[in-house]
A protein has these predicted regions:
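Bacterial Sec-pathway N-terminal export signals of envelope proteins
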Residues: 26-74, 78, 84, 228-271, ...
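N-terminal signal peptide c-region/cleavage motif recognized by signal peptidases
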Residues: 21-23
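Small/polar, glycine/serine/threonine/aspartate-rich low-complexity segments that form flexible
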Residues: 28-29, 76-111, 236-245, 291-325, ...
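Sec/SRP-type N-terminal targeting helices
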Residues: 49-53, 66-67, 113-140, 190, ...
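Acidic, low-complexity, intrinsically disordered peripheral segments
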Residues: 25-27, 38, 228, 416-441
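A short glycine-centered flexible hinge/capping loop motif at secondary-structure junctions
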Residues: 182-186, 393-397, 434
Length: 441
């Protein structure tokens, strides 16, 4: 009995230990940095996986085109039943020729000797592979941009929530102090009501900010292709990026759109159209093919297969095909030329638009950098004003309205400061995407 009890207890202990271990793991939250978020997204996001699969498909198509240069072999077979024999007339004599049953079978091997259209198709498919690679690069840049801005958005929501929560706790403390003084008869009911209103007015903002944190984290999880229930924390705050803002003011990097993915893709599309035009011109060129046949034939009047006599024969043929006239080829050339002209005009127009957009991002970064510098000083002054208002109220020389006003000014200065850093960072992320900068850890 004791042995059976021992056997029954062991599984229960193991289950309990496993539950404890799982509980410990669940309690450990992932501390996420921007680089980690980007790397997870690049490895798990379906958009990137689809782009990589597209490259593989294009490479397979390219190999299929190259295979057109290799010989092709096929086994053929035919049976012919003569219904009415052919009648021939010679020197006034008529006679019929032909056998009721004819069989033919063998192997045919063909090889393209000169196929200019195939050679142009090979160049076209290679450019198509390059275009797929560039599109995959654009997908990665777009995903990095989305994850980066989502991470900054989450930091902004987190920092805003921290500022509002601290302000709410301070307003609660102010209300507690004012209420205590009111009960002692040292302040008026108006001061008590003002402090309470200030506290309650902040509560909806705190709740909204908390919801904003959850929503921004959820958006980040979706981009990383992670389960929405996963809990994690963000490392750092927007204040940690202040050095990047001031470093951006000092540096004077050359701004160029030569790596822009949109322009690169349009250039490749123009190249493909030009190659397609060259391919269409090859429709006027001759093609030469070599063919080898090794066949067996048999003719019989009956169906006695075991008595059939099969006779082999073989031949080699060289065929030349010269297109003389096909009007569709001329219209195709005209259409392709028009498409090239349209795409080149769109490319020039897009380049001008992107240059304007680049300047807009630079202006936004400069304006945000100036705001960060100004708002940082505003926080220092607002903190001093709040401390003075608090001291004046404590000694009875200030009013609760002045204290509330100072508290609001400090909160607003902190929120504006973090917003300015966020605006700078998002404009910088958009600029890097526009300039075609690849992510480097």
């Amino acid at each position: 009995m004791r042995k059976m009890c021992s056997i029954g207890i062991r599984p229960m202990m193991m289950v309990a230990l496993m539950q404890c271990a799982l509980s410990t793991i669940a309690q450990e939250k992932l501390a996420l940095t921007l680089d980690q978020a980007i790397e997870i997204a690049l490895s798990d996001n379906p958009t990137i996986q689809v782009a990589e699969q597209t490259i593989q498909l294009k490479k397979i198509s390219d190999r299929e085109t190259v295979m057109g240069l290799l010989p092709e072999a096929s086994i053929t077979g035919a049976y012919t039943r003569t219904i009415k024999k052919q009648t021939m007339v010679m020197n006034g004599m008529k006679f019929q020729v032909g056998i009721p049953n004819q069989y033919q079978g063998g192997i045919t091997v063909s090889l393209p000797v000169f196929a200019p259209a195939l050679y142009k198709s090979m160049k076209l498919t290679k450019t198509d592979v390059e275009l797929a690679v560039e599109q995959a690069r654009a997908s990665k840049q777009d995903l990095v941009n989305q994850v980066t801005k989502a991470f900054y958005q989450a930091l902004l929501a987190q920092d805003s929530y921290a500022v509002l929560e601290k302000s709410f706790k301070q307003s609660e403390e102010n209300y507690r102090i004012v209420n205590a003084k009111y009960e002692q008869g040292r302040v008026s009911e108006f001061d008590k009501i003002s402090a309470e209103v200030q506290m309650r007015n902040l509560q909806p903002s705190v709740i909204s900010a908390r919801n904003g944190v959850e929503l921004s984290k959820l958006q980040l999880l979706v981009l990383m292709n992670i389960e929405p229930e996963t809990e994690f924390t963000l490392q750092g705050s927007l204040n940690d990026y202040e050095e990047i803002v001031f470093a951006g003011i000092l540096t004077n990097e050359t701004n160029s759109l030569e790596n822009n993915s949109s322009l690169a893709q349009m250039d490749m599309n123009v190249k493909m159209l030009q190659q397609n035009l060259s391919l269409n011109k090859q429709s006027f060129a001759p093609t030469i093919a070599l063919q080898f046949n090794y066949m067996y034939t048999c003719m019989a009047n009956d169906f006695k297969f075991k008595d059939y006599e099969w006779n082999p024969y073989s031949n080699v043929s060289l065929s030349v095909s010269i297109p003389v006239f096909k009007y569709k080829n001329f219209s195709t050339l005209k259409k392709t030329n028009i498409q090239i002209s349209q795409l080149m005009q769109n490319r020039d127009y897009t380049a001008r638009q992107l240059a304007m957009q680049q300047q807009s991002y630079l202006n936004s970064m400069n304006a945000s950098a100036e705001q960060v510098s100004s708002n940082k000083e505003a926080i220092i002054q607002a903190q001093k004003g709040r401390d003075i208002a608090e001291k004046l109220y404590e000694v009875g020389r200030g009013t609760v309205l002045e204290l509330n006003s100072a508290e609001v000014a400090l909160t607003q200065a902190k929120l504006t400061y973090t917003q300015a850093i966020y605006d700078y960072l998002t404009a910088k992320a958009d600029l890097e995407k526009l300039q075609g900068k690849d992510y480097v850890k």
